């Protein structure tokens, strides 16, 4: 299995372990496999047995082995077993599913059983194991420079804290996360963790990360890598839970020919890009539904064909803050597939985004056939919608949603008439992370799992930084210890 960039057809292909440590391609593009492995009905039936008899980690090893041929199978199985286990995850099923409304055939896939109570743990725990394994094999070290709007950073830090040969510099938008999210990250005092509060919004943080990566000399000197969703290994980890969710819902419904609709709360287009890849592999997903909040860049594209990024000033601070994103960093992967893997067109479009802030595919043949060929729908949700869905789901099902999952449930119900068959909303986080919104919706404080008791009372450490790449580089020079 070889990997190619979305931008340069002449560039040499790379192996999985090479791109694992690299993040962005040298030309600024994103990596994708040369071809997507194709799943047969027989393979899915066999995986049903693997999941039922041996568990989630065994399924993960099966799926990953289709994409990774430069890690021995036995080692890959060990990596998955260490990543997906209790008590790292609080539920032995790792990703259980629940039907929250039999009348609506509405399901939740529970992705928040990891150490930071967010779906990002699903990919990060695997990434931590992969990084440590490959760096150990090479006798090398890595500096992870990442950006987070809330959940990615804490998931990365909890997965990478204390690991040999790894340092983490994580950028956050100052004042844009909840107190719980800040406490989760800033209370980690490990020597290899550096938390940074940037004077700006999430996209400013992401731009700084990209600027560091584009400086080839600095990147090489400081062994810069990525854990943001531009890293292919993260997407690959997420593909597994779409397959697991489909298998579990098929088993519970008894429908051998199940075609499942998935609704994905979306900002960076990483989570739903994994659903797109699973669908391209032949997993029977009927529709892929993008659910956005008021920052509806993605919803606007699927409705109009125009992808128009927002400025920092036009990015709204909402009650589903992890989706307060104005530029979807993974979107390029889907556009590459949408355009028949035409890297020259893809490169030109995203160069246009960089210079003009938008591109328009509304008059193209590809956009006209987008829904037919790729199964996408999209809709957006508001603060009042979130409150209403949290309240309704609590009253009807006695299940407490977080605000991002509530965006997904709102969109699922909004588009229900267009979606035939069961609908699974991909849960993003536990409500404990968003106390203020939960109290507003249902009038009580969400229960705090024992592992998070008094987290906001712990000592915190964070470095404040302006929106300046040179300041970030100087911070890396002063804080990172280059050693294995």
Language model feature labels by segment:
Residues 1-484:
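PLP-dependent amino-acid enzyme catalytic core
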């Amino acid at each position: 299995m070889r990997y190619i960039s979305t931008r340069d057809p002449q560039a040499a292909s790379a192996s999985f372990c090479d791109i694992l440590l690299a993040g962005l391609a040298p030309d600024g593009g994103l990596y994708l496999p040369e071809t997507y492995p194709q799943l047969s009905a027989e393979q899915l039936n066999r995986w049903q047995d693997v999941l039922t008899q041996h568990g989630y980690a065994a399924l993960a090893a099966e799926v990953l082995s289709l994409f990774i041929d430069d890690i021995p199978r036995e080692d890959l199985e060990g990596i998955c077993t260490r990543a997906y286990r209790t008590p790292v995850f609080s539920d032995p099923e790792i990703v259980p599913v629940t039907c929250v409304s039999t009348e609506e055939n509405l399901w939740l896939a529970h992705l928040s059983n990891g150490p930071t109570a967010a779906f990002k743990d699903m990919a990060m725990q695997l990434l931590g194991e992969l990084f440590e394994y490959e760096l150990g094999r090479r006798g090398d070290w890595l500096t992870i420079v990442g950006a987070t709007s809330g959940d990615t950073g804490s998931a990365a830090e909890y997965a990478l804290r204390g690991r040999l040969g790894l340092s983490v510099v994580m950028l956050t938008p100052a004042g844009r996360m909840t107190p719980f999210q800040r406490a989760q990250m800033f209370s980690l005092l490990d020597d290899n963790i550096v938390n940074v509060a940037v004077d700006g919004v999430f996209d400013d943080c992401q731009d700084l990360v990209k600027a560091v990566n584009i400086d080839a000399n600095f990147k090489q000197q400081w062994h810069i890598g990525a854990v943001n969703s531009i890293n292919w290994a993260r997407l690959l980890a997420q593909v597994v839970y779409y397959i697991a969710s489909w298998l579990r819902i098929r088993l519970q419904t008894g429908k051998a020919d199940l075609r499942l609709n998935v609704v994905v709360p979306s900002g960076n287009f990483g989570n739903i890009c994994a659903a797109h890849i699973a669908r391209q592999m032949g997993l029977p997903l009927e529709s892929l539904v993008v659910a956005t909040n008021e920052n509806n860049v993605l919803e606007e594209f699927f409705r109009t064909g125009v992808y128009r990024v927002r400025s920092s000033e036009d990015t709204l601070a909402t009650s589903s803050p992890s989706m307060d994103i104005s530029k979807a960093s993974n979107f390029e992967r889907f556009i590459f597939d949408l355009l028949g893997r035409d890297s020259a067109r893809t490169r030109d479009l995203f160069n246009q985004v960089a210079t003009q802030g938008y591109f328009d595919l509304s008059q193209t043949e590809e956009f006209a056939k987008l829904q037919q060929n790729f199964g996408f729908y999209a809709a957006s949700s508001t603060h009042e919608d979130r409150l209403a869905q949290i309240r309704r789901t609590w009253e009807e099902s006695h299940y407490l949603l977080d605000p991002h999952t509530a965006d997904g449930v709102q969109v699922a119900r909004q588009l229900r008439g267009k979606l035939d068959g069961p609908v699974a909303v991909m849960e993003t986080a536990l409500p404990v992370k968003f106390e203020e919104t939960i109290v507003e919706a249902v009038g009580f404080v969400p229960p705090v799992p024992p592992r998070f008791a008094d987290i906001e009372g712990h000592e915190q450490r964070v470095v404040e930084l302006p929106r300046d790449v040179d300041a970030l580089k100087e911070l890396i020079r002063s804080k990172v210890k280059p050693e294995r």
